[in-house]
Curated annotation (Swiss-Prot):
Keywords: Acetylation, Apoptosis, Membrane, Mitochondrion, Mitochondrion outer membrane, Repeat, Transmembrane, Transmembrane helix. The chain crosses the membrane at residues 16-36, 78-92, 136-156, 181-199, 232-252, 281-303. It comes from Mus musculus (Mouse). The lineage of its organism: Eukaryota, Metazoa, Chordata, Craniata, Vertebrata. It comes from the Eukaryota. Protein insertase that mediates insertion of transmembrane proteins into the mitochondrial outer membrane. Catalyzes insertion of proteins with alpha-helical transmembrane regions, such as signal-anchored, tail-anchored and multi-pass membrane proteins. Does not mediate insertion of beta-barrel transmembrane proteins. Also acts as a receptor for the truncated form of pro-apoptotic BH3-interacting domain death agonist (p15 BID) and has therefore a critical function in apoptosis. Regulates the quiescence/cycling of hematopoietic stem cells (HSCs). Disruption phenotype: Mice homozygous for a knockout allele exhibit abnormal mesoderm development, disorganized extraembryonic tissue, lack of amnion and chorion formation, decreased embryo size and lethality at around 7.5 dpc. Conditional knockout in the liver decreases the sensitivity of mice to Fas-induced hepatocellular apoptosis and prevents the recruitment of tBID to liver mitochondria. Conditional knockout in skeletal muscle results in increased mitochondrial mass and metabolism granting protection against diet-induced obesity. Belongs to the mitochondrial carrier (TC 2.A.29) family. It is a multi-pass membrane protein. GO terms for molecular function: membrane insertase activity. GO terms for biological process: cellular response to radiation; establishment of protein localization to mitochondrial membrane involved in mitochondrial fission; hematopoietic stem cell homeostasis; hematopoietic stem cell migration; hepatocyte apoptotic process; lactate metabolic process; lipid homeostasis; mitochondrial ATP synthesis coupled electron transport. Solcar repeats lie at residues 2-98, 118-206. This is Mitochondrial carrier homolog 2.
């Protein structure tokens, strides 16, 4: 119980601290560029035309809504985080308790099993089920979080309170509205998890020397590196999921010119890929302006 409470508190603290970052990221993912590009330098010192970074973007939001505005959507996101942590822990606890009778077997067999790829598959499968269950239950809060952020673009107040947002979504879209963008989000999580754990196992088994004294530390590093690599590869699923969650929901940020009306998440994926926007919002610094791209800032000036 104490471990669960500490995880909830730690997760809530990190959620609060990262809220402004996520807010900016979501607006960029939608395609909202309120500030004009500037001439800057990339990490190699070369002059390039850049879009505003995280701090300039956050300062723009704060100049309109104040610093408190940077924490828009925090309440449903906290609810999602707390509920997700509890569900994830309960599912893993169920598997651990169901495995206890099997622990009476031979110690030698247990050691051989623990070092095999079968154990990696078993643990990854359990983690996948736990994460998927948490994602499925908390996705309605995720949708509300995204929509409350995106309404900054059109200065709407459609999704302000948690209860009012639930009523609005149910009245306009039914139960299905609470799960907009769920499929690409689940697929991204599952692919990322399996890719991360499989690569970490291969590195730890075949690339690292088991006789090294810092073996455990090196394994933790390899897990972190493979996790970062997997998240980079599966980022398009995150982008598509977030866009589908706000698409055609009655907000300016989910409608043209910021976002086309997508018929499905596959349609969204194809259109982003065709436009070369599969990594939009992945970087919050050194955001180079792609050649031939038109942003909402330019469209606003033409109106």
């Amino acid at each position: 119980m104490a471990d669960a409470a500490s995880q909830v508190l730690l997760g809530s603290g990190l959620t609060i601290l990262s809220q402004p970052l996520m807010y900016v990221k979501v607006l960029i993912q939608v395609g909202y560029e309120p500030l004009p590009p500037t001439i800057g330098r990339n990490i190699f010192g070369r002059q390039v035309c850049q879009l505003p970074g995280l701090f300039c973007y956050a300062q723009h939001i704060a100049s309109i809504d104040g610093r408190r505005g940077l924490f828009t959507g925090l309440t449903p996101r906290l609810c999602s985080g707390v509920l997700g942590t509890v569900v994830h822990g309960k599912v893993l606890q169920y598997y651990q308790e169901s495995e206890k009778p099997e622990e009476l077997g031979s110690v030698t067999v247990q050691k051989e099993y623990s070092s095999s790829f079968d154990r990696v598959i078993k643990e990854t499968t359990r983690e996948m089920i736990a994460r998927s269950a948490a994602t499925l239950i908390t996705h309605p809060f995720h949708v509300i979080t995204l929509r409350s952020m995106v309404q900054f673009i059109g200065r709407e107040s459609k999704y302000c309170g948690l209860c009012d947002s639930i009523v609005t979504i149910y009245r306009e879209e039914g139960i299905v509205g609470f799960f907009a963008g769920l499929i690409p989000r689940l697929l991204g999580d599952i692919i990322s998890l399996w890719l991360c754990n499989s690569l970490a196992y291969l590195i730890n088994t075949y690339a690292l020397d088991s006789g090294v004294s810092t073996m455990n530390e090196m394994k933790s590093y390899s897990q972190a590196v493979t996790g970062f690599f997997a998240s980079m590869l599966t980022y398009p699923f995150v982008l598509v999921s977030n866009l589908m969650a706000v698409n055609n929901c009655g907000l300016a940020g989910g409608s043209p010119p910021y976002s086309p009306i997508y018929t499905s998440w596959i349609d969204c994926w194809c259109m982003l890929q065709k436009a070369g926007n599969m990594s939009r919002g992945n970087s919050l610094f050194f955001r180079k302006v792609p050649c031939g791209k038109t942003y909402c800032y330019d469209l606003r000036m033409l109106i």
